């Protein structure tokens, strides 16, 4: 199963992005796929970016941002995932990874999102930041752009 990072969603939405066309085309190309999962954690981050004037020239209102997020949450073919029923083992693995001397504090949220998706069957992750997600446990991490 494939899941999508926030940066791909943002590029697909933001017409001012140099990567807009490629991201939009890729998102469009997987619309009929049924082996796609969208993470509530990724959507929460996407919501924040949609409202941020440092990210978008014309940030969205709260209502507009939720409307965009809801289009992904209500996708007729894609699976919506949040925390797995039993999240203790996932968080045990997260804190174990966080003890590594080379673990950057800013990686905590991405690692939690990745472990949550993996625990629910996601094997492939599409992101612009491939190196940030390599070695987390996905079988494949790639940039579709």
What are these regions (language model features)?
Residues 134-145:
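Short, basic/aromatic-enriched C-terminal tail that caps enzymatic domains
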Residues 1-38, 50-67, 131, 135:
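Short, well-structured N-terminal submotif of metal-dependent ribonuclease cores
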Residues 50-86, 91-94:
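Active-site-proximal, substrate-binding regions of enzyme catalytic domains
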Residues 38-44, 108:
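Aromatic- and histidine-enriched alpha-helix N-cap/loop-to-helix transition segments
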Residues 53-57, 99, 143-145:
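Short, hinge-like loop/turn segments at secondary-structure boundaries
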Residues 33, 77-128:
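Active-site neighborhoods of divalent-metal-dependent phosphate/nucleic-acid chemistry enzymes
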């Amino acid at each position: 199963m494939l899941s999508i990072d926030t940066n791909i969603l943002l590029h697909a939405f933001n017409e001012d992005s140099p990567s807009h066309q490629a991201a939009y085309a890729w998102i469009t190309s997987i619309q009929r796929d049924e082996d796609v999962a969208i993470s509530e954690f990724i959507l929460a981050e996407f919501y924040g970016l949609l409202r941020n004037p440092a990210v978008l020239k014309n940030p969205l209102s709260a209502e507009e941002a939720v409307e965009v997020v809801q289009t992904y949450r209500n996708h007729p073919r894609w699976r919506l995932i949040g925390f797995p029923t039993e999240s203790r083992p996932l968080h045990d693995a997260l804190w174990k990874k966080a003890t590594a001397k080379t673990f950057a504090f800013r990686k905590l949220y991405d690692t939690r999102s990745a472990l949550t998706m993996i625990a629910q069957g996601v094997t492939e992750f599409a992101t612009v930041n491939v190196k940030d997600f390599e070695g987390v446990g996905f079988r494949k991490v790639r940039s579709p752009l």
